[in-house]
A protein has these predicted regions:
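Acidic/His- and Gly-rich active-site-bordering loop/insert found
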Residues: 1-122, 126, 136-144
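Acidic/histidine-rich catalytic neighborhood of metal-dependent amide-processing enzymes
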Residues: 120-167
Length: 167
């Protein structure tokens, strides 16, 4: 059951959230089926960025790295029964830059949109979840039930992290 009052986002929050998503898009978390081609350092930077941008979530969520890139946060609720999970992935497919009208990892704002890999699939979802949880934690919120945040860095290559998180 969802209840509560919806708040209108103020312009400062909108700018902050846009900036945070832009920072995520700029990190080249490109997955390759040949794992040796994947730049692991970009994935490490992405995870550090999450800790830096969302310190309350990082602390309350007892973040765990599962497998190479899987992230699992558990935010204890008033009850461990009937837990809720939000999921997203933060890896992207390779981008042939010559086929783009702009740098696919620029994260630039253009005509009110954030441009680049992950801005729609699905760093935007991950950013939205983290922003919402961070805001609620800032308000002193304790979820009614345990809340899990599950993020994979291998979705684009059908990696094992999501399965490992479930287990």
């Amino acid at each position: 059951e969802v209840s509560g009052e919806l708040k209108k986002m103020n312009e400062d929050a909108g700018r902050r959230i846009s900036s945070n998503l832009s920072k995520m898009v700029r990190l080249k978390t490109v997955s390759h089926f040949a794992a040796a081609e994947t730049d692991e350092a970009e994935f490490v930077k992405f995870r550090q960025l999450l800790d830096d941008l969302y310190p309350l979530t990082a602390e309350a969520g007892q973040r765990r790295l599962i497998g190479r890139t899987g992230l699992l946060y558990r935010i204890p609720g008033k009850s461990a029964e009937k837990a809720c999970v939000f999921m997203a992935h933060y890896d992207v497919v390779p981008a042939e830059e010559s086929e783009w009208d702009f740098d696919p990892f620029s994260g630039e704002m253009k005509d009110g949109f954030i441009c680049g890999r992950g801005s729609l699939d699905t760093k935007c979802t991950l950013c939205s979840v983290m922003e919402a949880v961070e805001e609620k934690l800032r308000e002193g919120w304790i979820p009614a039930h345990d809340l899990y945040l599950s993020f994979s860095g291998e979705e684009e290559v059908e990696g094992e992290d999501a399965d490992a998180i479930v287990k």
